[in-house]
Amino acid sequence: MADEQSALLLGIDSDHAYIAVMLDENTDVAPLWVTLRDVGAQLSPLDVGLAITATALATWHNTHRYCPQCGLTTQISDAGWSRTCPKDCVTHFPRTEPAIIVAVHDSEERILLGRRTNWPENWYSTLAGFVEAGESCEAAVVREVREEVGVEIDLESLQYLGSQPWPYPASLMLGYSALASTTEFKPSEDEIAQIRWLSREELSSQCESGILKLPNPAAISWHLIEHWYGQPLNPEWTRG
C-alpha cells in the first residue's frame, strides 16, 4: 500500500492523475524490471514523459534523503516534488544538471562519432558532456569537443536542435549541430577509445555490416545523427 512517503504525483492530464510508487526490496509485488532505454522508443510521448519524470524524482529522493544543513532525514513533501527538513523547515527541490550533446560535421559533410572507453567495440555516438559552473552551453560545446577529441569548433556554426531530459541521474541534454574548423583528432585516452569521421555512405555501409551500432532511437543522439543524415535512419542500425 502506497503512503505519502512513497507515492509521487507525476501530473494530471485530461482529469487523470498519474502517480508513481517507489518500491522497496521487501515488496510483495514481483515486477518485470526494464530500463527506459529498453522500452522508450516503444512508448507514447505521454508515457515517455511520465517514465522520465518518475525516474528523475525517484532517483533524487533516493540520493537526497538527508538535510545538507543539519544531517537529519528529510520528509517527502509537495506530492513528491520536494523534501522538507523537520528541524530547519527548509524545503529542498530536485536539481537538473545541463549537459550538451553535439553532432559535429566537417566541410565535407562527414560526421564525427566516438566510442567511449567503457563501450563495446562497435558502439558509437555523438559527443557529450556536462556544462560547467559559470559556462554557457555554447562554450561547453567548444570545450567538450576540444577536450574529448582535440577538434576545434566554429562557434558561429552552432545550431540548437532540441533537448531531452535524461534522468541518469538528473541531466537535461541540450542538442546541437556544429561545424568543425579542424579535422585532425586526438582522443582523450581516459574517455574516448576511438573516433571516426564518416560520410553518409560510410555510415550506412558500416551500420549494415555491423561494424557500427548507433544509439537507441529513444536517445537524442539518434535524432542528431538522423538530422545530419538527412533521412530516417534504419532502426536495425541501433545497438538495441
What are the residue ranges of the model-derived segments?
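Active-site-adjacent beta-strand/loop module that shapes the phosphate/pyrophosphate-binding cleft
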Residues: 164-186
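The catalytic Nudix box helix
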Residues: 126-161, 176, 184
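Cys/His-rich short segments
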Residues: 53-105
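Nudix hydrolase/Nudix homology domain
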Residues: 1-64, 75-76, 119-124, 169, ...
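Short acidic-glycine loop/turn motifs at beta-strand connectors
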Residues: 12-15, 106-108, 182
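Conserved hydrophobic/aromatic beta-strand scaffold that supports enzyme active sites
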Residues: 9, 66, 84, 101-103, ...
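Short beta-strand micro-motifs in enzyme catalytic cores
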Residues: 6, 18, 81-83, 98-100, ...
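N-terminal strand-loop-strand
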Residues: 83-125, 130-131, 159
